[in-house]
Design a protein with these regions (language model features):
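Glycine-rich beta-strand-to-loop/alpha-helix junction loops that act as flexible
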Residues: 62-68, 136, 224
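Two-metal-ion RNase H-like nuclease active-site motif
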Residues: 2-8, 129-132
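Short hydrophobic alpha-helix segments
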Residues: 29-31, 81, 152
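A short acidic/small-residue loop/turn micro-motif
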Residues: 33-34, 85, 155-158
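Glycine/GP-enriched mid-protein hinge/lid loop-to-helix segment characteristic of carbohydrate kinases
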Residues: 17-19, 23, 27, 38-39, ...
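Conserved phosphate-binding loops in N-terminal lobes of ATP-dependent enzymes
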Residues: 5-66
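Phosphate/ATP-binding catalytic cores across multiple sugar-kinase/actin-like superfamilies
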Residues: 215-225
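Glycine-rich phosphate-binding loop and adjoining helix at the ATP-binding site
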Residues: 35, 39-47, 61-62, 69-128
Length: 225
């Protein structure tokens, strides 16, 4: 059965694994992105991940899902937010294909999530679907007739930068903002909590977490509307 190295580069963590052609994973792992160290550091992490996989498996291809605007033809990051310094211009596809001589495809992470939902998830069977992701930032993607709608300049769905209440959608409603808010309310180190922690505490009745989530949901409602 064919196997592919699949790597998702997010602003907070890099999730990676070996995906088989029956859409099941042989293995899955996760590591911190350390985004503030910049694009070169991330590319080195990706190279090392593929190198380790290549020693264990015969890889048919490399699939990269990444934060930032991506030229899906060249596999280059054409724009990245300040969350990942010096990531713009990173030639992921070219670098990996040259390093490993294995076909590589690179796409925006939200577009990848939308494709997954469209073909095997909640939007399966639909002709047109919209996927909104809420993580370190906020993004969306549009699928029309089984293909990602990229728009004239490749930026269709980049709703995170939408102006809202004197700021941007993602600077008000992303999960990273939720974490910062709860950390400040509880006077704890931001490194000690994450979104999962906050929602679990809210289920147990934590008033600070409930209040912060309510405020986040209000922002998301405004933005989606």
């Amino acid at each position: 059965m064919k196997k592919y190295a699949c790597i998702d580069v997010g602003g907070t963590s890099i999730k990676y694994g070996i995906l088989k052609e029956d859409l099941t994973f042989e293995e899955r792992c996760e590591m911190d992105t350390h985004a503030k160290k910049g694009g070169a550091n991330i590319l080195n992490k990706v190279i090392n991940i593929v190198k380790n996989f290549k020693e264990k498996y015969k890889l048919e291809g490399i699939c990269i899902s990444t934060a930032g605007m991506v030229d899906c033809q060249s596999g280059e990051i054409i724009h990245s937010s300040s969350l990942i310094p010096n990531y713009t211009g990173t030639k992921i596809k070219e670098t990996l294909e040259k390093e490993f001589n294995i076909p590589c495809e690179v796409e925006n992470d939200v577009n990848c999530a939308a494709l997954a939902e469209h073909f095997v998830g909640g939007a399966k069977g639909s002709k047109v679907s919209l996927c909104l992701t809420i993580g370190t930032g906020i993004g969306s993607a549009i699928i029309i007739n089984d293909e990602v709608y990229h728009g004239a300049f490749g930026s269709a769905g980049e709703v995170g930068y939408m102006n809202m209440m004197g700021s941007t959608f993602q600077d008000l409603g992303a999960s990273s903002i939720l974490v910062k808010k709860v950390a400040a309310m509880k006077n704890i180190d931001i490194k000690d909590i994450n979104g999962k922690y906050i929602f679990e505490k809210a289920k147990l009745g934590d008033e600070d977490c409930i209040k912060a989530i309510d405020e986040m949901v209000e922002v998301l409602g405004e933005g989606i509307a």
